[in-house]
Amino acid sequence: MNIMNNKIRTFLKSCGWYFLASVDEGAARVRPMGFCAVLSDGRLYFGMGSDKRCCKQIQDAPQVEVCACSADKEWLRVRGKAVFSDDPAVMEEIFAGNEFLRKKYSPESGLKFAPFYLEDMEADYNKMDGSCEKWV
């Protein structure tokens, strides 16, 4: 799984931004995101501030989907059940690799980062020619 998670992360990072879909009171919500990382535990992590409405939506309805499109007109959809982590080691590893997040979510800011990984993850890689590969 670690190799596939790295492949997914590489594609998402190459796109620059991806879109995260969640559900809020029965309605779809989509927003741009930029953070993803594969940590030493082999899991692919996403995250946002714990104060964001998106965080509450995902806690209430953890089935989410991520979609990213490349300049080559290829796209990746990743879905699963979000599982939040409050493990200090996870947070430390995320902040060690991301100066922006480390500063934004420093103890002085009063803000808290809420990382999550996807359980029962599925991923489809698609091309404009109609081909589709199951990555997970």
PLM feature segments, named:
Residues 1-6, 48-54, 99-101:
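Charged, amphipathic alpha-helical segments
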Residues 10-26, 64-68:
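A short, Trp-centered hydrophobic/proline-enriched beta-strand micro-motif
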Residues 19, 43-45, 77, 124:
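General beta-strand recognition
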Residues 28, 42-44, 123, 132:
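Hydrophobic residues embedded in beta-strands of well-ordered beta-sheets
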Residues 33-37, 80-82:
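Hydrophobic/aromatic beta-strand elements that line small-molecule binding cavities or substrate pockets
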Residues 36-71:
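A short mixed-secondary-structure module that forms the rim of ligand-binding clefts
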Residues 77-136:
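Charged, gly/pro-rich active-site loop segments
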